[in-house]
A protein has these predicted regions:
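Oxidoreductase cofactor-interface core, primarily capturing Rossmann-like NAD(P)-dependent enzymes
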Residues: 2-24, 40, 51, 58-68, ...
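Terminal hydrophobic/aromatic helix or amphipathic segment near a protein terminus
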Residues: 189-233, 269-270
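Short, polar loop motifs at secondary-structure junctions
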Residues: 23-31
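Amphipathic terminal alpha-helices
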Residues: 246-270
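Conserved Rossmann-fold cofactor-binding substructure of NAD(P)-dependent oxidoreductases
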Residues: 35-51
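Short, charged/polar "capping" segments at the starts of alpha-helices
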Residues: 8, 30-34
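Short helix/strand-capping connector loops at secondary-structure junctions
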Residues: 235-244
């Protein structure tokens, strides 16, 4: 499992081990029992004795760097005898998002690489949705308006990846679109017991550029595209793929988003 120190990678690794699957993680800064896998250092990409590779997207960069990283890992997988690749991609409904092209380009690489493959088109996290609400005075603000997001709890996506990786042949050549139940910013605010105020997309872009320190150059357009997609109803479609794969109901994305928003609540607003 690549990206094993990240949120999705670590949860996927834990889910595999909970199922009794012999699994190891790879990371640029590996913990105990992990392999060093630095996507920017091809000499570190040792995948010998790996039967199934769960390639967690290395999306925290510009598109060309992301695709280059993924290509290097996939080349190593072919070289070292990996027998199946599972790639965590982006939901089909996200084709218009600012970071979609790196995912679709990687899907092409996966499908053309000569190894059996499965693609998991993951919906946007409920944790992300809740975390993007901004506390202001006695309530929350967002650029989402009344638009809904078919959000997914990260833990469900980790469980889905573990299920596929534990029995990859069953899912060979398949693309699973893993989205959840549509939720709105207003619903999150209601659960929190506070009002929700919509801000314009132009104001949101201005805040990203002028009032949000620490963002890298690719992040403002990425976040703005998410806001536009949610606001105008491009990310609210759902499919049964997630629950069919899990064999159980999905975790409540609204409760997950509420918990994420609550975690950023200023003490003075409590």
């Amino acid at each position: 499992v690549t990206g094993a120190n990240g949120n999705l990678g670590s949860a996927t690794l834990a889910a595999l081990r909970a199922r009794g699957v012999a699994a190891t993680g790879g990371s640029r800064m590996p913990g105990a029992g992990m392999r060093r896998l630095d996507f920017d250092d091809p000499t570190s990409l040792d995948l010998t004795e790996v039967s199934t590779l769960v390639l967690v997207s290395a999306g925290y960069a510009e598109d060309d760097q992301v695709v280059g990283r993924h290509a290097a890992v996939l080349d190593a997988a072919v070289r070292d005898g990996v027998r199946h690749v599972v790639y965590t991609s982006l939901t089909t409904a996200g084709d218009h998002l600012g970071f979609a092209l790196a995912h679709r380009a990687t899907e092409r690489l996966v499908q053309a690489g000569g190894l059996p493959w499965t693609i998991l088109r993951n919906g946007l996290y409920a944790e992300l949705f809740g975390g993007l609400l901004r506390w202001s005075g006695s309530g929350v603000e967002s650029p989402f308006g009344d638009g809904a997001l078919a959000a997914v709890a990260r833990a469900d996506l980790a469980d889905a990846a573990a299920l596929v990786a534990a029995d990859p042949a069953r899912h060979s050549g398949r693309v699973h679109d893993l989205v959840g139940t549509p939720i709105t910013a207003g619903q999150v605010a209601d659960r929190l017991g506070v009002p929700h105020r919509t801000i314009g997309l132009g104001e949101y872009r201005r805040r990203l550029l002028e009032e949000t320190p620490g963002l890298l150059s690719f992040q403002p357009p990425m976040l703005a595209s998410i806001a536009t997609g949610i606001r105008h109803g491009f990310l609210d479609g759902t499919t049964p793929d997630l629950t069919d794969l899990l064999g159980r109901p999905a975790r409540d994305p609204l409760a997950t988003a509420v918990a994420a928003a609550s975690a950023t609540r200023p003490k003075t607003s409590a």
